[in-house]
């Protein structure tokens, strides 16, 4: 049975995870290992959903998003090696590839988009890299973290705009 592999990209807060769930299939994230690591550090696992709020007991201004970004990028991608999360994601996806729809809800870097294409070729399945947008949730040029700069347009195979009603569902 052949199926599809989808990667979603777009600005933070646009609704990528919500859109992924609406597609059905298996939703996975490149950030899953990072989130699992943070569960040990955060005061409570619920802080993973409160990404923009300062975390009590940490230096002023430290948020879950800041911790996800620095652990994932500065430590994982830059200090260890660029494909650390791609390799982990492949291990998570392998049981499903070619058997079910698989959706990655957090493409943030070109190597992640490239991995989606490579895995689709390897498993002889179709793939899409879908850019999700929503009015009022554009990429913020003042956000200096590289993970928020978006991926080059040549990776994107489809553009989808969601509205606030779709986001809330």
What are the residue ranges of the model-derived segments?
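ATP-dependent small-molecule kinase phosphotransfer cores
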Residues: 32-99
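Hydrophobic positions on the alpha1 helix immediately C-terminal to the Walker A/P-loop
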Residues: 19
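Extreme N-terminal starter segment of soluble prokaryotic enzymes
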Residues: 1-6, 128
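Hydrophobic anchor at the beta1->P-loop junction of P-loop NTPases
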Residues: 6-8, 104
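Conserved lysine of the Walker
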Residues: 16
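P-loop (Walker A) phosphate-binding loop of NTP-binding proteins
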Residues: 11
């Amino acid at each position: 049975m052949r199926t599809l592999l989808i990667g979603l990209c777009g600005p933070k807060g646009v609704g990528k995870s919500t859109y992924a769930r609406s597609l059905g299939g298996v939703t996975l994230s490149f950030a899953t290992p990072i989130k699992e690591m943070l569960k040990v550090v955060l005061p409570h696992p619920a802080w993973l959903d409160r990404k923009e709020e300062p975390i009590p007991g940490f230096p002023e201004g430290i948020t879950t998003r800041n911790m996800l970004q620095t652990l994932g990028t500065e430590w994982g991608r830059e200090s260890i090696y660029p494909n650390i999360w791609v390799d982990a994601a492949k291990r998570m996806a392998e049981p499903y590839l070619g058997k079910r729809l698989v959706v990655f809800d957090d493409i943030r870097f070109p190597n992640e988009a490239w991995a989606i294409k490579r895995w689709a070729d390897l498993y002889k399945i179709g793939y899409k890299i879908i850019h999700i947008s929503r009015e009022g949730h554009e990429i913020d040029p003042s956000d200096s973290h590289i993970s928020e700069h978006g991926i080059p347009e040549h990776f994107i195979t489809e553009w989808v705009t969601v509205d606030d009603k779709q986001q809330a569902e």
